[in-house]
Amino acid sequence: MAAEEEAAAGGKVLREENQCIAPVVSSRVSPGTRPTAMGSFSSHMTEFPRKRKGSDSDPSQSGIMTEKVVEKLSQNPLTYLLSTRIEISASSGSRVEDGEHQVKMKAFREAHSQTEKRRRDKMNNLIEELSAMIPQCNPMARKLDKLTVLRMAVQHLRSLKGLTNSYVGSNYRPSFLQDNELRHLILKTAEGFLFVVGCERGKILFVSKSVSKILNYDQASLTGQSLFDFLHPKDVAKVKEQLSSFDISPREKLIDAKTGLQVHSNLHAGRTRVYSGSRRSFFCRIKSCKISVKEEHGCLPNSKKKEHRKFYTIHCTGYLRSWPPNIVGMEEERNSKKDNSNFTCLVAIGRLQPYIVPQNSGEINVKPTEFITRFAVNGKFVYVDQRATAILGYLPQELLGTSCYEYFHQDDHNNLTDKHKAVLQSKEKILTDSYKFRAKDGSFVTLKSQWFSFTNPWTKELEYIVSVNTLVLGHSEPGEASFLPCSSQSSEESSRQSCMSVPGMSTGTVLGAGSIGTDIANEILDLQRLQSSSYLDDSSPTGLMKDTHTVNCRSMSNKELFPPSPSEMGELEATRQNQSTVAVHSHEPLLSDGAQLDFDALCDNDDTAMAAFMNYLEAEGGLGDPGDFSDIQWTL
């Protein structure tokens, strides 16, 4: 009984405390709600740690938390409620701070977005102003993107890069010159006439007085007239094309960045700047003033000779310019058409194009036919231009190694040998007269040559002679099939020189002419040695032997190439015996060093050296006697 009474008393006390605490808890937790009964409070306390939807907490754990709360409330309700109030106030304070931070961030973002918007608007306004300043952007029907506008601006600046302020603005003349003086100087320098023509109808707005010197027109008779009335009918379309002002701006291909297509513009110039695409230069034929021609006797009254109108070829150069209509005095015509666009016209200078009269001879002026050859000091070809094949018929390899004198006509040898000696002794260019050169087909072509020598700058030795050969038209001569006597020479020279017809060799050239160049080279070299050396030992035995045994090629070329006479053979035999006797007693070779050197030079004389050896063998071995060829089985 006592226990039951104590439990009842404890429950009573607990109920009283709960009744006292319930209003406080209800006021703290939900200030807008009124205090409820004990049952509602207990149910509220039991439902406080209810599991939230979607949480992973265990229901048993939530029950344990509820029991702990009840236990704390039963032990010290006031302390627990005060601690709970502090936690609630702290959480509410943190929530307030988070809200203030969010408000500040939102305000900052709004300010930043407003700044960016103002920047974009300012950039768009600048792009629009830039597009309004660029002539290529004005006539566009649709709005261009920013990248296209910037590209057009760059192209426009590039087109103006080559222009100077003196040609763009109004200050195009020096301050000390007046407009009339400057115009007079321009017309005097250009030797033409200045004119201004409207681009729409071709109306002549202005023409200078100097037009009377070229076209025989008065200044007043042309002003206000149409230029197309004075043009040749075949030139009207061309001049209209030049007067068209659709391409007054620079001709650039513009690509839209969005679509990737080319931007086509129909430009109407509204500024006075001179663009690179506005320059005009063309030729046209303009009528001159009527010239009365006197009627000749026997001519019909309606003859075309009564009135003669002549066309002159005029070279027109200038620029297309645009002005407001009120400046050029065209406002009335513009008002009648209700057109407020600028007036475009051509400002140009016309110059008379000279007419070249063709030659009466009928010959056409063409570039002269030339080819280049190089030959050594002795006249042998070392280089032949490929163009020589079309003129001479020889391949370059056919001429290499041969002497140029083998192809020169014999009548030109004297002149060419003098030129050959001159070019070896001089560093200047030597011009030859016209001479005949034998072609491959046997005919002779006439050439003129310019010779000059080339000296090696390191060795200081003359290496070769350069010959620039020019073909002289209309002077080719066919080869002669029969023998022609050399009438220019004396009877004595003609009797000594053998003019034989050799198969495969055209007449007009000399047999053995290949040695002429070598003789000239040796002569010039000897002359240079004599001039360079101050002393020459001619009295030494070696010099005597050299003088005795040296073969003179020049004398051989002029002598008759036949067996010597018996007296000459005797002298030659005696000389040979004396030479052998001297060689035996002196124990020296038959030929001295000088003779051996001259023997080498003799071998370079080609045909002359071979003829000399044949004469010597005929004299020594009896090869010149007729032989018995009866035993030979073939016919000769």
Curated annotation (Swiss-Prot):
Residues 178-250, 357-427 form the PAS domain. It is found in: Nucleus. It comes from the Eukaryota. There is a cross-link at residue 287 (Glycyl lysine isopeptide (Lys-Gly) (interchain with G-Cter in SUMO2 and SUMO3)). A motif (Nuclear localization signal) lies at residues 49-54. Induction: Constitutively expressed. Has no circadian rhythm expression pattern. Residues 46-258 are annotated as: Interaction with PER2. This is Basic helix-loop-helix ARNT-like protein 2. It comes from Homo sapiens (Human). The gene is BMAL2.
